[in-house]
């Protein structure tokens, strides 16, 4: 019965044996610590510590890279009661055996009888666990009583980070320990240091270590071998404080400079003497500008001063006043046109009266400077009729029965000079188109009556309403009312197809400014003028009417 029972239990024990071995290995790894560092060239140093390690057991570290064909093994040597260490030599000291992409599998193997037992395992990334070799070749370059210059070298450092290094140094003074020594940090690759504030004739020791800036688990290298040096003794009778002499020299120079400047400013005889010393040859401006020198007595400042007061150049002054635009009815007296101080009365726009205006832009050409060029005011005259278009029959029948508009009285005094009409010759020069009509207008004696100048309704119906009037010309000072230059009634009747008798021998030819217009002429003019609701004439419109004369 015992044999059958053992037969089915044996396969079960074989299956459970690997599991028991892995549990034992995990227990061993849980109480051990395995740490390795790469020196960036061809050396991997490892330290393994184990609690309750077996006595008289040999252990070793085996390295197996994933991208290389070689493998290396080193014997762990005891460094303390529970720790061992070894160095994996991968090749020549300065050869680059590993790169940043390599991963090395490290195992700690211990012998148990005739078999090797795995005690620890690690996937090692060389450039994430860097520790360089300690600096070498420390030497004193220069030593004085209070300072010392020391240099060193770095061995077996990879070219991957040879420019990305930092250093720490410490100096051991008498009566202190290395742990108490202050650390001096160099954040760049600087293989020398200048120690200051040292005591003369004193013995010191110096150490330095290095660390690359690359790697997550990178650590400082071991401290270098101590370098002992001694400062020079101080000379007899010499001040032991070096900065005091420099301070005295600086203060003496500053006081001397201040005294020299004071003497140069306050000494009256310094000017000619200084010119002779500096050999300054300044020319006399009076030799070249004799007229200015005689006018201002040799004062150069008056030569360069402005002839105008400073207020003339002030941008904050009052702006020049601009002449107002006045619009008055034709029936108003002329004196109201030039009263600038008073506000003009609003014109009552009706369908029976035309309006006239006089605009002057004298204010635009006013200057404050005494030598400025004065420009004479330019006057612009224009008319407009704001009434709406009426029926010709109703217009004739509804003509005002009152007296005809009386001509305005001529101006006098300053007002007459302000807004006057041009002379006959100037008017012809200003608007030569007055002579370019089909024939000069003719007037009959007694033309002032309204009934004599009025046309029959039958003739008024035949007159075209969109007839374009001739260019306007300003009247003479004797007749200030502005009347458009129009063809005579005979010409209008001929165009309408009616027979009109020729003028008698007593009917002379005259221009429209030679007689006062009648009421019928105003009505005929108003009936022919197109509706114009604009109250202003621009400069371009004036030039368009008469391009030979520019305003």
Curated annotation (Swiss-Prot):
<dbReference type="GO" id="GO:0019221">
    <property type="term" value="P:cytokine-mediated signaling pathway"/>
</dbReference>
<dbReference type="InterPro" id="IPR003961">
    <property type="entry name" value="FN3_dom"/>
</dbReference>
<feature type="disulfide bond">
    <location>
        <begin position="36"/>
        <end position="46"/>
    </location>
</feature>
<keyword id="KW-1003">Cell membrane</keyword>
<dbReference type="GO" id="GO:0005893">
    <property type="term" value="C:interleukin-2 receptor complex"/>
</dbReference>
<feature type="glycosylation site" description="N-linked (GlcNAc...) asparagine">
    <location>
        <position position="149"/>
    </location>
</feature>
<dbReference type="GO" id="GO:0016064">
    <property type="term" value="P:immunoglobulin mediated immune response"/>
</dbReference>
<feature type="glycosylation site" description="N-linked (GlcNAc...) asparagine">
    <location>
        <position position="43"/>
    </location>
</feature>
<keyword id="KW-0812">Transmembrane</keyword>
<feature type="domain" description="Fibronectin type-III">
    <location>
        <begin position="134"/>
        <end position="234"/>
    </location>
</feature>
<dbReference type="GO" id="GO:0004911">
    <property type="term" value="F:interleukin-2 receptor activity"/>
</dbReference>
<feature type="region of interest" description="Disordered">
    <location>
        <begin position="432"/>
        <end position="486"/>
    </location>
</feature>
<comment type="function">
    <text>Receptor for interleukin-2. This beta subunit is involved in receptor mediated endocytosis and transduces the mitogenic signals of IL2. Probably in association with IL15RA, involved in the stimulation of neutrophil phagocytosis by IL15.</text>
</comment>
<keyword id="KW-0325">Glycoprotein</keyword>
<feature type="disulfide bond">
    <location>
        <begin position="59"/>
        <end position="110"/>
    </location>
</feature>
<dbReference type="GO" id="GO:0016020">
    <property type="term" value="C:membrane"/>
</dbReference>
<feature type="short sequence motif" description="WSXWS motif">
    <location>
        <begin position="220"/>
        <end position="224"/>
    </location>
</feature>
<dbReference type="GO" id="GO:0005886">
    <property type="term" value="C:plasma membrane"/>
</dbReference>
<keyword id="KW-0675">Receptor</keyword>
<feature type="region of interest" description="Disordered">
    <location>
        <begin position="389"/>
        <end position="416"/>
    </location>
</feature>
<comment type="similarity">
    <text>Belongs to the type I cytokine receptor family. Type 4 subfamily.</text>
</comment>
<dbReference type="GO" id="GO:0019976">
    <property type="term" value="F:interleukin-2 binding"/>
</dbReference>
<dbReference type="GO" id="GO:0005768">
    <property type="term" value="C:endosome"/>
</dbReference>
<dbReference type="GO" id="GO:0004896">
    <property type="term" value="F:cytokine receptor activity"/>
</dbReference>
<dbReference type="InterPro" id="IPR040951">
    <property type="entry name" value="IL2RB_N1"/>
</dbReference>
<feature type="glycosylation site" description="N-linked (GlcNAc...) asparagine">
    <location>
        <position position="71"/>
    </location>
</feature>
<dbReference type="GO" id="GO:0050766">
    <property type="term" value="P:positive regulation of phagocytosis"/>
</dbReference>
<dbReference type="GO" id="GO:0009897">
    <property type="term" value="C:external side of plasma membrane"/>
</dbReference>
<dbReference type="GO" id="GO:0005829">
    <property type="term" value="C:cytosol"/>
</dbReference>
<dbReference type="Pfam" id="PF18707">
    <property type="entry name" value="IL2RB_N1"/>
</dbReference>
<feature type="glycosylation site" description="N-linked (GlcNAc...) asparagine">
    <location>
        <position position="29"/>
    </location>
</feature>
<dbReference type="GO" id="GO:0007165">
    <property type="term" value="P:signal transduction"/>
</dbReference>
<dbReference type="GO" id="GO:0035723">
    <property type="term" value="P:interleukin-15-mediated signaling pathway"/>
</dbReference>
<feature type="short sequence motif" description="Box 1 motif">
    <location>
        <begin position="278"/>
        <end position="286"/>
    </location>
</feature>
<feature type="topological domain" description="Cytoplasmic">
    <location>
        <begin position="266"/>
        <end position="551"/>
    </location>
</feature>
<comment type="subunit">
    <text>Non-covalent dimer of an alpha and a beta subunit. IL2R exists in 3 different forms: a high affinity dimer, an intermediate affinity monomer (beta subunit), and a low affinity monomer (alpha subunit). The high and intermediate affinity forms also associate with a gamma subunit. Interacts with SHB upon interleukin stimulation.</text>
</comment>
<dbReference type="GO" id="GO:0015026">
    <property type="term" value="F:coreceptor activity"/>
</dbReference>
<keyword id="KW-1015">Disulfide bond</keyword>
<keyword id="KW-0472">Membrane</keyword>
<keyword id="KW-1133">Transmembrane helix</keyword>
<keyword id="KW-0945">Host-virus interaction</keyword>
<keyword id="KW-0732">Signal</keyword>
């Amino acid at each position: 019965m015992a044999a059958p029972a053992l037969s089915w239990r044996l396969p079960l024990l074989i299956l459970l044996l690997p599991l028991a071995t892995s549990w034992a290995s995990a227990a061993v790894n849980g109480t051990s610590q395995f740490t390795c560092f790469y020196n960036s060239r061809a050396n991997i140093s490892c330290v393994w510590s184990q609690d309750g390690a077996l006595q008289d057991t040999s252990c070793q570290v085996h390295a197996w890279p994933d991208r290389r064909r070689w493998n290396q093994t080193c014997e762990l040597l005891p460094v303390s009661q529970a720790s061992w260490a070894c160095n994996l030599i991968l090749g020549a000291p300065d050869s680059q055996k590993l790169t940043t992409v390599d991963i090395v599998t490290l195992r700690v193997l211990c012998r148990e009888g005739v078999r090797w037992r795995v005690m620890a395992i690690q996937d090692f990334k060389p450039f994430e666990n860097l520790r360089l070799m300690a600096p070498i070749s420390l030497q004193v370059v220069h030593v004085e009583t209070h300072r010392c210059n020391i240099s060193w070298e770095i061995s077996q450092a990879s070219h991957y980070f040879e420019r990305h290094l930092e250093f720490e140094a410490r100096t051991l003074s008498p009566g202190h320990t290395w742990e108490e020594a202050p650390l001096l940090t160099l954040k760049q690759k600087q293989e020398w240091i200048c120690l200051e504030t040292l005591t003369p004739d004193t013995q010191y020791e110096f150490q330095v270590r290095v660390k690359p800036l690359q790697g997550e688990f990178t650590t400082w290298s071991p401290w270098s071998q101590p370098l002992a040096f001694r400062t020079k003794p101080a000379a007899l009778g010499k001040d032991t404080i070096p900065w005091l002499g420099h301070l005295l020299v600086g203060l003496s120079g500053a006081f001397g400079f201040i005294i020299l400047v004071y003497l140069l400013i306050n000494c009256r005889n310094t000017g000619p003497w200084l010119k002779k010393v500096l050999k300054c040859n300044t020319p006399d401006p009076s030799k070249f500008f004799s007229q200015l020198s005689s006018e201002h007595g040799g004062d150069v400042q008056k030569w360069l001063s402005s002839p105008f007061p400073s207020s003339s150049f002030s941008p904050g002054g009052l702006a020049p006043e601009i002449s107002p635009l006045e619009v008055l009815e034709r029936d108003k007296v002329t004196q109201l046109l030039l009263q600038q101080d008073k506000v003009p009365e609003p014109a009552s726009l009706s369908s029976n009266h035309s309006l006239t205006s006089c605009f002057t832009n004298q204010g635009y050409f006013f200057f404050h400077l005494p030598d400025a060029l004065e420009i004479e005011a330019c006057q612009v005259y224009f008319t407009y009729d704001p009434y709406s278009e009426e029926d010709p029959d109703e217009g004739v029948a509804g003509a005002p029965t009152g007296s005809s508009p009386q001509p305005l009285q001529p101006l006098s005094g300053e007002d007459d000079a302000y807004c006057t009409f041009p002379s006959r010759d100037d008017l012809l020069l200003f608007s030569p188109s007055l002579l370019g009509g089909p024939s000069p207008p003719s007037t009959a004696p007694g033309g002032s009556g309204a009934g004599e100048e009025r046309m029959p309704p039958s003739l008024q119906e035949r007159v075209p309403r969109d007839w374009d009037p001739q260019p306007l010309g300003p009247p003479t000072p004797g007749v200030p009312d502005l009347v458009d230059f129009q063809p005579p009634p005979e010409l209008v009747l001929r165009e309408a197809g009616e027979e009109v008798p020729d003028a008698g021998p007593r009917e002379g030819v005259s221009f429209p400014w030679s007689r006062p217009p009648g009421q019928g002429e105003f009505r005929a003019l108003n009936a022919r003028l197109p509706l114009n609701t604009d109250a202003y004439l621009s400069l371009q419109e004036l030039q368009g009417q008469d391009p030979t004369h520019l305003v």
